[in-house]
Amino acid sequence: VTGGASGMGLATVERLARDGFSVAMVDRDRALAEREAQRLQAMGLAVQAHVLDLTDEAAVRALVDQLSPVQVLVNNAGIFDERKFDVVSSADFRRAYEVNLIAAATLTQAVSQQMPDGGRIVNIASRAYLGARNHPHYVASKAALVGYTRASAMELAPRGILVNAIAPGLIDTPILRALTPERLAAQLALQPTGKAGQPEDIAQAVSFFASAQTGFITGQVLFVDGGKSLGGSGA
């Protein structure tokens, strides 16, 4: 699980460990990853922390060699920042694609080459890929990740490796808590459910895709967004 030391990633690590998996928590923050891994280990869960810069392809492939074979890959790590449409730069686009798409593609390629037939890959996209204001580089990178999900699902289906994506909406993470009260209220007003989701909601969806009961589902996007994708203006 990449980006596994906080937020949705941490909830996913704990959920998969409770499902019986031995989980590699991959994160760039050594102190945080080691602290959270120790906390989960104290609960009797099989979790190991691994520090990795996902933009370092050689390091990515070295870690995959160390961990292989991997039964389930969760590409959760990503970056988000706001840029107005008329000021977003080519550097902003490159950085978003480097982390939100290319890192996931590199890891998927490396893992799938050694993954047992019947493995599972889950990509964490975003409801924003449908279109949203004030972060066009992020929207584009997540839309690209959805496209890559479908392409890799077709490539890997003959081996029984299933690839799906989850598109979270408003989830209670540090990014959401950083919003001003007015901005948060405006966002929640657009939610049919009137509330934000929890990281555990995403972890539950990952657990579903990682399970043996999903043997005929691949190339799909599951929206976990409190109904936001049903309509309304993007934010």
Predicted segments with their positions:
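Short C-terminal tail/terminal secondary-structure segment
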Residues: 207, 218-235
